[in-house]
Amino acid sequence: MKKLLLIAALVLPGPAMANTLDVITMKLKDGCTFETYLGITKEFNASWGKAHGYNAQLMLPVHGPDSSMVIWVGNTASAQTFGKAWDVWRNAMANPNSVEAKLQARFSACSTQISRASYDTYQ
């Protein structure tokens, strides 16, 4: 019986687990370097992101139609984790003294958002 259950577990499809990616395309403002924006992103990851299950990395295009873009890719374990983190971030914007609002002010001073999308990833 144990062998039959083991075979069934290996052969039958199981639930798919998906990370959720938060992808933001932006351009840096004059006077803001990539290194400056990367520094803000590292602070975000170390403080806010880690506490909310969200980790961001930045991508620079090697080939593409616009090499001036910077792409933010935030990664969470699930859509639920992303939703909870987003609720905390969005609600904190009402308090200009919150950690979130202060980080957002630094991001906004350094970049102009072009687009935003989210994706579930599967392996």
Predicted ranges, named:
Residues 1-2:
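N-terminal hydrophobic targeting signals that begin at the initiator methionine
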